[in-house]
Structures are given as structure tokens and as C-alpha cells.
Amino acid sequence: MKKVIAFSALAMAGVFSAQALADRGKTGFYVTGKAGASVVTQTDQRFRQDFGDDVYKYKGGDKNDTVFGAGLAVGYDFYQHYNVPVRTEVEFYGRGAADSRYTLDTWHSPIVGGGREDTQNRLSVNTLMVNTYYDFRNSSAFTPWVSVGLGYARVHHKATYTDTSWNESGKVSDISALHYSGYDNNFAWSIGAGVRYDVTPDIALDLSYRYLDAGKSSLSYKDAEEDKYKSEVDVKSHDIMFGVT
């Protein structure tokens, strides 16, 4: 989270310094800093335990977690010189860690107590996208637009498996946990819409929504007894962003 906040501050600072340079030449090139809330959705969560001949499969459903996001884009506006209401940009966008936790199994015994197995997924999604925008230009200072994007998503996946036991009186008697992490490099695509407000001929504010599909994340690991575990999830994000160009 601290890295994302720091990047957001640098992105906004870079916008104004680069904007001053670009305005003098009216080249059509622009720089945009973006920040906002990302609702990261972990859909169709799956967990598998492989204990030799015994295999157990669990479903965790869908889970949303709202995190902070920020990014920086460098683009070109074709309207400046070609009178075509299209923009194309390269954008990096980072998001904070989104958490999801669900229970795999619970058991009870009147003699020895009981136990519960839980798993947790923590995902961080960074994207590098090529975005194309179509601007619905008009005579006002407000310009609605729609967008599509294609690119690369790097998903950092941390998984925790926890086995908790309690005695017949209900007190926790033992907790064991496995922690593993890994990365997935995926194809990503997005669609979006928004509106831009021209504060001055050289400065614009932007409010937008984007749906991002970042592919699937899969993490496999073993414990000391060579028992196998696998956590899988489909990764999506709903980005609500404020931008300064």
C-alpha cells in the first residue's frame, strides 16, 4: 500500500512537470496521473488438498475487496493534428493488496473437541496496458468517452492455509499455518467509460470507470509431509479513477 501511495504522489508530480513541457509544442502528446479506488474481485475461488490417495476439493465463491490504486499514462491525442477524436496511451497502474478468506471444513466431536480449516488469498494486481479512447467531442467543456485496453497483468498471490483445533471445553489447543506466495503473468483486457472536464486549454480533469479482467492466479505448494495444496482464483477489478492531464 505504501508503494502505491508513493507512486501516486510521483505520478501527479510528473503530470505537471511533463505538462509544462508538452504545452509549449502542442505536439498532441500528454501525460496523465490517475488515482482512485479499485474493487478487486476474486471470483470462483477453488482450493484442493491432495493427501496421497485422498483428494479434497472446496469452493470459496466470490469475494470483493476495495483497495487504493494509482497509475501514470503517456499518450497521444490524434485530434490535435488529424481532427480524429481518438487517443492512445500506455498506462501503468498499481493496486493495493486485496484479501479473501473462507472456511474449508469444520468438524466437532463431543470427546476430543473439534477443528476448522481455513484458507486466505491476498492478491496484488499491477497492469501495463495499451488503452484506446474515443472522445465524444462537443461544444462544452465536458467530453464523454469510452475505452478499450489490452495488456499485461502481474498478479502477486499470497496464500495461507490454517488448521485450528480446540479441546472439549471449546478452547483453542493448536494452530498450524502454511504461508506461500508466487507470481502469475497474464494477458489482461479492459473496457471503460468516463468524462473529461477541460479546466483550461492545457489542464483537464477526468473521472472514469474501468472493468479489468486480469486472468487466473494459481498457487501450488507442499507441507513437510509432502501433502499438496493448490489455491486458484479468477482475478478482476472495477477501477474508479480520478485523473489529471
What is each residue range found by the language model?
Residues M1-K26:
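Cleavable N-terminal export/targeting peptides
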Residues R24-V39:
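Transmembrane beta-strand segments of Gram-negative outer membrane beta-barrel proteins
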Residues G33-A37, A70-Y76, V130-Y134, V148-Y152, ...:
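Residues on the lipid-exposed face of transmembrane beta-strands in outer-membrane beta-barrel proteins
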Residues H81-V86, S140-F142, Y197-L205:
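Repeated loop/turn-to-beta-strand initiation elements of outer-membrane beta-barrel proteins
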Residues T119-S124, D135-A141:
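Helix-adjacent hinge/juxtasegments
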